A protein has these predicted regions:
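Conserved PLP-enzyme active-site core in the AAT-like
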Residues: 1-104, 109
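Active-site beta-loop-alpha junctions enriched in small/polar residues
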Residues: 8-10, 14, 113, 138, ...
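Short, flexible turn/loop "capping" segments at secondary-structure junctions
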Residues: 35-36, 66-68, 125-128, 185-190
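Short, well-ordered beta-strand elements within core beta-sheets of diverse protein domains
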Residues: 73-83, 131-138, 194-198
Length: 218
């Protein structure tokens, strides 16, 4: 059996699964590696010549090759990857700590917080904790919908990994087709909100979310 790891959230800058025994690492080039929400692509990374040949044969057979301009955009994005990821991580940690202390929030999911069940594991294998977080609003499905609709710094969208901050509500967007009982059982509550923390000033993000919370819950 082969072990494959999706390293999109972490990027090679923060985590390198091949060093931890993975056979295949998948990376969405659309997200942090491109970094500017203007290209589409993906990559598989291996450290085995035979496996590389097998994957290369399949890639050529199905025509899964990027266009030249898409490749240029990804290569351009890699030049600023370290400085962008440092800012994503810094902002995400500060925002997670702020959310954790906010009365409108029940729970925050971010591996950089000591309250996260996998914090120690993440600290062992990652150089930092990334720019993705989610939190559970102390409110209903409609109130969570109001929050994601009222933000101005955060753009309502399902993607992630660009320089701009994005916000989305899984229960009403990415997982809307799943019956509520199944969704709740899987941990996707009505008030769950996912955030891709961008590189804007973190104080602007806090002000934006605070105003959205007030609009939804007051």
């Amino acid at each position: 059996a082969l072990c494959a790891v999706d390293n999109t959230f972490a990027t090679p800058y923060l985590q390198r699964p091949l060093e931890h025994g993975a056979d295949i690492v998948s990376q969405s080039l659309t997200k942090y590696l491109g970094g500017h929400s203007d290209t589409i692509g993906g990559a598989l990374i291996v450290d085995d010549e035979e496996l590389d040949e097998r994957l290369g044969f399949y890639q050529n057979s199905v025509g899964a090759t990027p266009g030249p301009f898409d490749a240029f955009l990804v290569l351009r994005g890699t030049k600023t990857l370290p400085v962008r990821m440092d800012r994503h991580c810094e902002n995400a940690m500060e925002l997670a700590e702020w959310l954790q202390g906010h009365d409108a929030v029940d729970r925050v999911y971010y591996p950089g917080l000591e309250s996260h069940p996998d914090h120690e594991l993440a600290a062992e294998q990652m150089d930092d904790f990334g720019g993705m977080l989610s939190f559970e609003l102390d409110g209903t499905l409609d109130e969570a919908s109001t929050v994601v609709s009222e933000t101005e710094v955060f753009t309502l969208a399902e993607s992630l990994g660009g320089v701009e901050s994005l916000i989305e509500q899984p229960a009403a967007m990415t997982h809307a087709a799943i019956p509520r009982e199944e969704r709740i059982a899987a941990g996707l509550t009505d008030g769950l909100i996912r955030v891709s923390v961008g590189i804007e000033h973190v104080d602007d993000m806090k002000t934006d979310l605070a105003a959205a919370f007030d609009a939804a819950l007051s």
